[in-house]
A protein has these predicted regions:
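Short N-terminal segments
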Residues: 40-52, 57
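Short, extreme N-terminal segment that most often corresponds to the first beta-strand
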Residues: 1-45, 207
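Charged interaction segments
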Residues: 52-207
């Protein structure tokens, strides 16, 4: 599982009722994030443009249209598509939304939709500030090794969301280990059998 890959992981405490409501609520607009231009600030891609306007695809309007269409899909639609192709944990477990999303040989533009999707989860979250870890590059799909900076950290809450330029990453990584374990378990075996979705995917999202 090496190659240019991008991953998101989070654990956002919320009730089952909140989780189900979030699944059927389209992602909010970019205004939900207080400082979208600061997506890379302080981390491995510091200095790069956030490019929420998708100017990199100015000559490919069909790509921009497809990305904008994804931003109008509900989390249920986005995650159901994910489950079909593998590479994710998406579940409500122990009174929390747990996600681990993996894009192999991809670019990080798709992640903008997923960050908006998770920013929208704050509306249904328990009181508090809840981090979303975004990392990737020419790395494995495992959580970052100690000392390796992520690409970004988004903090979501009932008040909205914002990017931060520092965060106790080692502690965050350790808190995400159980979700990582469920993700890695999907790739056990020789690949001849269909992956067991029981632990990794919520019943509401299974085929």
């Amino acid at each position: 599982m090496s190659g240019r890959s991008f991953m998101l992981a989070t654990r956002v405490p919320m009730s089952r009722t909140g989780f189900e409501a979030w699944l059927d609520t389209p992602p909010p607009s970019l205004d939900v994030i207080e400082n979208p231009a600061a997506m890379w600030t302080g981390w491995a891609a510091a200095g790069d443009a956030a490019d929420w306007d998708l100017t990199a695809f100015a000559d490919s309007p069909h790509i921009v249209a497809a990305m904008r269409a994804d931003q109008r899909k509900t989390p249920r639609e986005l995650l159901t598509d994910r489950v079909k192709t593998g590479g994710c944990v998406a579940r409500h477990r122990d009174e929390a939304l747990e996600l681990y999303l993996y894009d192999y040989h991809a670019d990080f533009y798709r992640t903008r939709t997923e960050l908006l999707m998770l920013a929208g989860a704050g509306r249904y979250a328990d009181v508090g500030a809840h981090p979303v870890l975004f990392w990737g590059g020419n790395v494995y799909a495992d959580l970052p090794i100690a000392g390796d900076p992520p690409l970004s950290v988004l903090v979501v809450s009932r008040a909205g969301a914002h990017f931060v330029d520092r965060y106790p990453i080692d502690a965050l990584v350790e808190s995400l280990r159980p979700i990582e374990a469920a993700f890695l378990a999907r790739y056990e075996g020789d690949g001849s059998a269909e992956p067991d979705l029981t632990d990794a995917v919520d019943p509401d999202l299974r085929p």
